[in-house]
C-alpha cells in the first residue's frame, strides 16, 4: 500500500522551535508515525505555508508530483488552515478545496479529505474568529466531500496539542494525530 499525504506545515512536520523551517525528527511526525502503524509506504508531501493550490503553476506542480508517485492507494489532503490565516472566508476556502479536489485524476474512493484540527489561542491566533472558522471549515468540508463522493475525516475533536503559536502540532500533537488518523482510516 502507498499513501501520499499532501498538506501544509503540519503534514511536513514543521518544528516551530527552529527558526528556518526545520522538521521534527521522523519519529515525531504524524506522517512517519502513520506509516509505522499502517505498515506501508507513506510519502510526505507537506510544505510550510502551503495553501490550497489554485494557480496554474501550483496545479501543474501537484499534477507532476501525483504522476511521479502513482500508483497510489490513497491520497490524503489536509489543507485550508493557511488559507484561513490569510484572511479568507470559510466559503472561499471550501470553494477552493472543491475546485482542487474536482480536478484530481484519481478514483474518488482513493481521495481522503482531512478537516484540520482546531487551532488554539496562541502567538499566531489572537482572533476568536479563526477558532470559530476552523470548526466551520470542517462542516463545509464535510459537505464538499459528500458532494464529490470522497472520504472525509473530521479532526476537529481530536484534541491535538499545539505549540506556542496555536497552529503547529507539538510532538505529542503529532502522536495524537497519527493515532486518530490511523483509527479513522482502518
Regions found by a protein language model. Name each.
Residues 28, 36-37, 60-186:
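Alpha-helical cap/lid subdomain in secreted, periplasmic
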Residues 1-47, 51-55, 63-68, 175:
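Serine-esterase "nucleophile elbow" of acetyl-processing enzymes
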Amino acid at each position: 500500500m502507498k499513501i501520499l499525504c499532501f498538506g501544509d506545515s503540519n503534514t511536513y512536520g514543521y518544528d516551530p522551535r527552529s527558526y528556518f523551517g526545520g522538521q521534527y525528527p521522523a519519529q515525531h511526525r504524524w506522517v512517519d508515525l502513520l506509516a509505522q502503524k499502517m505498515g506501508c509506504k507513506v510519502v510526505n508531501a507537506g510544505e510550510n505555508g502551503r495553501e490550497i493550490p489554485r494557480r496554474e503553476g501550483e496545479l501543474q506542480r501537484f499534477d507532476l508530483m501525483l504522476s511521479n508517485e502513482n500508483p497510489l492507494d490513497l491520497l490524503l489532503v489536509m489543507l485550508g488552515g493557511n488559507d484561513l490565516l490569510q484572511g479568507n472566508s470559510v466559503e472561499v476556502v471550501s470553494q477552493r478545496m472543491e475546485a482542487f479536489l474536482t480536478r484530481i485524476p484519481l478514483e474518488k474512493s482513493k481521495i481522503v479529505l482531512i478537516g484540520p484540527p482546531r487551532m488554539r489561542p496562541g502567538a499566531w491566533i489572537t482572533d476568536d474568529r479563526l477558532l470559530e472558522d476552523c470548526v466551520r471549515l470542517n462542516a463545509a468540508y464535510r459537505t464538499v466531500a459528500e458532494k464529490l463522493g470522497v472520504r472525509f475525516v473530521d479532526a476537529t475533536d481530536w484534541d491535538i496539542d499545539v505549540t506556542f503559536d496555536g497552529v503547529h502540532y507539538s510532538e505529542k500533537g503529532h502522536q495524537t494525530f497519527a493515532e486518530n488518523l490511523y483509527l479513522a482510516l482502518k
